Design a protein with these regions (language model features):
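Structural motif
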Residues: 24-25, 35-50, 145
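Short beta-strand segments within Ig-like beta-sandwich modules, predominantly Fibronectin type-III
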Residues: 67-72
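C-terminal motif of bacterial Sec signal peptides marking the signal peptidase cleavage site
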Residues: 16-19
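A short, solvent-exposed beta-strand micro-motif common in secreted/extracellular proteins
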Residues: 75, 81-96
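Structured interaction patches on ligand/partner-binding surfaces of diverse proteins
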Residues: 93-121
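A short, amphipathic beta-strand motif
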Residues: 30-41, 75, 138
Length: 149
């Protein structure tokens, strides 16, 4: 039993030492940030965990899997990336807007900003929320953008 523990310990230590050399790249330092807009106005979105996703692709490497970027409730998104050209697309049927998978080409270098223009089914404006005697009340205007929505 002692011999098995010793062999297992040496094997584990060897694997640990070998694994240190596998990740020899510096971490990415460039920052991509953007917003999702309609007619120049930033959209508010449903903020569930992983709700609205964008996908980044970088050509020229063996791994062609997308880098998933999540949008926040205020319609912004961000990612820390390596410098280089990326393709940004919305995930298929993943947002409250007309499904459009146009590719946005983004050259990431340092601090980079971009805008994803979409056509939402509806917009909400003039939100007014009040609290009176532990009763929450709210009003807003809803505009239908897509007529067959």
């Amino acid at each position: 039993m002692k011999k098995i523990r010793t062999i297992f310990s040496l094997l584990s230590l060897s694997l640990l030492a070998i694994s240190c050399g596998l990740d020899n790249y510096d971490e990415p330092e460039s920052f991509l940030e953007g917003k999702i807009t309609y007619e120049g106005k930033q959209l508010g979105l449903k903020g569930t965990n992983g709700g609205i996703q964008l996908q980044l692709y970088q050509d020229g490497y063996a791994n062609h899997d997308p880098i998933t970027v999540y949008a926040t409730q205020d319609g912004t998104f961000s990612a820390v990336l390596f410098d280089g050209p990326y393709k940004l697309v919305t995930k298929d049927k993943n947002g409250p807007w007309v499904n459009n998978r146009d590719t946005i080409y983004v050259e990431v270098k340092g601090q980079t900003r971009c805008e994803v223009k979409v056509t939402p089914y509806f917009t909400i404006s003039d939100e007014n929320i009040t609290l009176d005697n532990n009763i929450v009340s709210g009003t807003c205007n809803i505009q239908q953008i897509v007529q067959d929505a």
